[in-house]
Each structure stands twice: as structure tokens, then as C-alpha cells.
Amino acid sequence: MSQLLDKETLKKMIRENVKTLYRKTLEAASAEEVYQAAVFAVRDVITDKWMKTHDEYYEKDVKVVYYLSMEFLMGRFFGNSLINLEMYDEVKEVLEELGIDYNMVEDAEPDPGLGNGGLGRLAACFLDSLSTLQLPAYGCGIRYHYGIFEQKIENGYQVEAPDNWLENGDPWGIKRNEYAVEVKFGGNVRAVPKGNGEYRFVQENYQSVIAVPYDYPVIGYGNNTVNTLRLWEARAKNKLDLKFFNEGNYQKAAEEELLASTMTDVLYPADEHIQGKELRLRQQYFFISATVQRVVERFKKHHTNFHELPDKVAFQLNDTHPTVAVAELMRVLVDENDVPWDDAWEITRKVCAYTNHTIMAEALEKWPMELFSRLLPRIYQIVEEINRRYCLELQAKYGMDHEKLRRMAIIADGQIRIPDKAIAE
């Protein structure tokens, strides 16, 4: 077994955890309760490696890959973690010596509702590989409350129910309130003169939510590296409006909390209607803005020259959903850190990389200009400027071929074409 955890110590920890968590003896505990107790025991070993890994990254100021994805189909953490820690056989023996069927304990873990199919599984495999290869990396996404759905068959027909994978708690995720950031939506943008004909752009009259990260360990196989899957959860800036509550308008009083909760409830909400489209765009910008803001703040602890950012940070955009990261990084550099546009664009192009997974038309996202500009007004301005400069490059290369320019432009026919935006960068 691990040099940090012998069999007798593990047995004692599982018994003590059952008692502390559930006020029960081990013999009276359910499989789900034993599972939770075993996770907290094993997590001691994981956390030691996890802390050492990130202390080393910080001290050496290494370059870190941030893999941005709407989904991560990780599968159950328990068994995979034990295999990568090379503790699987020993933990199984310990549970059997305690009179517990290991398979029942493993089956008690809910499958995290964080992914759907190939895109999410690819993201999970990349994270596993990066840890096993001992390459510094974060996965960054959303901590969905319900994922896609739980499938039931009734009278031969599929019935969809919420997949409440967090119902009995989450022993793997560690809430990091100290890294929470504000994400802004809507409002208007005001240009404030800075002098010399330059302006600073300020977003006003906006709605905002607080993005709170939860960190999950991604363990390398047979080594001491533990990277991080960071999933963001939305929280209302003001959970309860006491004025409305005291007036008896309880629904209005909790409106802000409901809006925030909805943002991280479900992976891929139905988008046949405008409300669904808006929710999807909110989700995408929410986790991207939170990630970019946090990464830049982390970079600034070591550095003052933003031209060094590409030497320390790489954003890998997994399909079209995270591509708003291009404009968001520009916003953070230009608006919040006074980096000149041309310098910021050079930095952004070096930091961001994009992988497209399909050429099916339905998978190549487009956003109505009205929705995009209303929900993300400053990001829309930045995309407009990127598009203007990109079209000038196209004109210089292809001349005034209006049909070619229309087909290749980022903004055309009342739509913002997301793949074109990613490729243009």
C-alpha cells in the first residue's frame, strides 16, 4: 500500500469517517456511506501529492495548459483514482477484510453529470494523459448540478428526469471561495477618455453573478503528479432581496439567485427558443470569463510584462463553445490592464489554440447579433473590431470579392460565426 497509508490505518480511518460523517458504526452504514468514508480516507494521500504538485508548479513558475471545455466526461472518480495511485488491490482487500463488498462501494458513487459524449470523453482523456505525462495542466469547465438527464424507460418509452448526481454530497470537489470572481452580463459600455485620443471602456448597468470554483484532483498513473479539474459554479451576488421579501414578493426576492442557479444547472439546455439560446451563451461566457480573469490574476503574481504571458499560459479551446475566450482575454488585457490593442492581439494569438471536432453545420455555432450584443456588449465591440481588421486582411489578400468576404467574415448576415472567430485569431 501507499507509504503514507498502511492497511490498518486505512481501516481505522474508514471506521472513524463513518462515525464522524454519519453517527453510525461501520456495520450499520450503507454502501453509499462507506463509499464516502473511504473517499475521505484515500483523499489524504491524494491531497498530499496534490499540494506538492502545485507548490512545485508555483515555485518553478512553469507554463500551464488550461484545457477549456463545456464538458468533461470523467466517469467515476473512486476506482480510477485508486488505479492511478496503484492502491486498487490494497483498498479492495481492506474493504473485504472489513466485511464489505468492494463492488457495492464502487457502484455507490454517482457518475458525475459533467459530460455527454465524445467531446467530454476526449477532454477527460487529455487531462488523464497530461497528469500521467507530468505536464502542468488545468481542466476548466462548469460544475453542472444535473448534467444532461437520467434516462428511465416507462412502457417502452424514454422518460427524462434530472440527474441529481450531487444529491448525497460531493467528496471529491473542494470549494475555493478565495478564488471567486465576478462575471458581468448586459448593460452598456461607456468610453472614458484617457488622453492622447485614447479611451478606456467601462461596462455599466450590468447584471452579474459570482463564479465560485470547485477543484477536483486528476491523478497521474504511477507518479506523484496531481493536476486539477476546476469547475465553476454560479452564485448570486445578492442571494435575497430583503425589500421584496418583506413586501411578500418572495419570487422577486429570490430572482437573482434563481438566475444564477439556472446558469449551472444543465449541460446543453434546449435552444429551440431564444431563452435557451441566451442561457447557452451565458453558460459559455460565464466559465470562460471566470477562467481568464483568474489565470491573468495568477500570472500577475509573478510577472509585470504581459508579453511573457504566452511563455506561461496556453488556452486550449475544445471545440466552438469556449472560443469567446479570444475576445475575453483581449478585454482583460486592454480594458483592465491597459495593454495596447496590437500588443494584446499578438499575445492573445500566441496564448489561444483551437481544435474543431466536426464540420457539421448544426455543430458550427452562430449567435444572433442582437442577442450577443445585448448580453455581452463589450465582448461584441471587441469581436466587431477583430472582424473589421480581419476583413481588411482578407481584402488585401483576395481583393474586393464581396461574396468571398461575406463567407469568410466573422460577422455577416446578422450572425456571429463562432468557428470563423476562432480561426481568425
Where are these regions (language model features)?
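A conserved ligand/cofactor-binding region detector
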Residues: 1-425
